Amino acid sequence: MGKILGIDLGTTNSCMAVMEGGEAVVIPNAEGARTTPSVVGFSKKGEKLVGQVAKRQAISNPENTVYSIKRHMGEPNYKVTLQGKHNTPQEISAMILQKLKADAEAYLGEEIKQAVITVPAYFNDAQRQATKDAGTIAGLEVLRIINEPTAASLAYGLDKGEVEQTILVYDLGGGTFDVSILEIGGGVFEVKATSGDTHLGGDDFDQRIVNYLLAEFKKTEGIDLSKDRAVLQRLTDAAEKAKIELSGVASTNINLPFLTVGPDGEPKHLDIDLTRAQFQKMTEDLLEKTLVSMRQALSDAKLTPNDIDKVILIGGATRMPAVVELVENFTGKKPYKNINPDEAVAIGAAIQAGVLGGEVKDILLLDVTPLTLGIETLGGIATPLIPRNTTIPTRKSQIFSTAADNQPSVEIHVLQGERGIASENKTLGRFTLDGIPPAPRGVPQIEVTFDIDANGILHVSAKDLGTGREQSISIQKPGGLTDAEIERMIKDAELHAEEDRKRKEEVETRNNAETLINAAEKTLKEAGDVATEDQKSKVNAAIDDLKKALEGKDAEEIKAKTEALQEAIYPISTAMYQKAAQQAQQAAGGAAGRTDAKGPEETVVDAIMR
């Protein structure tokens, strides 16, 4: 079996590693560097450039250079135009992967066909699928997609030999942020919770400096540079350099001569001092966002900062002193610094590749799904099948039914999110199961199965248990959650929890009432002489009362009338059951030991159908 490449496909930089002699080794690229800028461009002569060479020519050729494409993975309508050709994020990412693959092959002297690629823990299904597709386009069989914080913990835990540790992994990369809580012990790496923001990273810190420089230049020179792409590229490069320098010094000078020309043709230069204190002040809200995610992850894991044994920082942006201070103050632990934050994820990916290839033994990786998955049911309710932070791979099935008599099909509306109301969540996909035989509502049994594979990619199927007819969908729909959508899902779930609970309870109360009315009317038709006229009259009156209550909006009134109908129908149902039992015994001829009693019925939830 050939080498399996471990790849950290980053927003700003990418890194690769393989297992050699039982150890994960970082592979340098063709230029000799251990990381490769995630930049793609085309020279003015039409030559494709990837990595450092693409980054170097960006200032003079910004319109044909692409940065931070990872931020757009999974977006359906996002295209990048290079040399007149429209490219998807998958295609741009594939160009980066192709360079990594070629450089690894040159270094190892053998062909690379397979890879393990990492993604942010908070990447949704569409973003994960897009990453896998990029690998396929690059000529790689992607054996596994794993979360970056989990990969970093593998890099940390492989040679430590310690057991039963709770680890917080804080991953602030170029364009994404994740925090994960893991328990490590006995070779098992189990993710307990994860939280984050797929649109927060070092790029955002750079942009704050760029905005500051633009404002200062406009204030002193009266010139707006925000529309000049070449100037913006120079400012972005200078901002990144200043950010890095401020990790080691208290103040830095940003000097960009001949930045532009004034109305009189005179050259204009930029010369500004920036202190670490100024930089931290202009970015404190970004750091606060990461603090919110840390609190969320600990809450989901049902832990406190005191329960954390070790803290790992990964991603180049964690070199900023303010980040280190924030994490240390929150957890009360000094971050573990014996891992290169730029290389830890690739090393972990290589270790996972070693597990898959049989080179690494006695390691079990248990990752989680970041958001709740479910379907829409009658009344617009979001019915969860797989809660967030469930260990993957996982499979869950639940029985649903029809919402109307003689319903020929059901639509399965697949959702992702934390709200109790379907319309407040993210739609992942829809599909229809046809060919359901005519039957009263609630009778057909439709088994809906959610299956999340080890890559975190969801597959959904629906099966009519009566006919065996089945329909399925792999959720590979392009498009994904924005950072605002992800943050809104968690925050809205907390802010509107009581409102959702009441709305859900009201819908369920109505559903139960309508179901009981149908059952009661059916029972009356089948009762025959088992029920007295007085009993039938009471049931009909109770049905009328409940129908009238359903015309209003008083949930308590509906509940009361539902209970009244249950009490009215109970004597008839009991008498019918006893009669059926007597007939069954007579049909059995009194044979000893023989029974025809039914087993317990399965709970059926009505599925919404459009």
Swiss-Prot record:
Coiled-coil region(s): none
Disulfide bonds, paired cysteine numbers: none
Keywords: ATP-binding, Chaperone, Nucleotide-binding
Keyword Chaperone: yes
Pfam families documented for this protein: HSP70
Molecular functions (GO terms): ATP binding; ATP-dependent protein folding chaperone; unfolded protein binding
HAMAP family according to UniProt: DnaK
Family: Belongs to the heat shock protein 70 family.
PANTHER family in UniProt: HEAT SHOCK PROTEIN 70KDA (PTHR19375)
Function text: Acts as a chaperone.
Protein name: Chaperone protein DnaK
Organism field: Methanosarcina thermophila
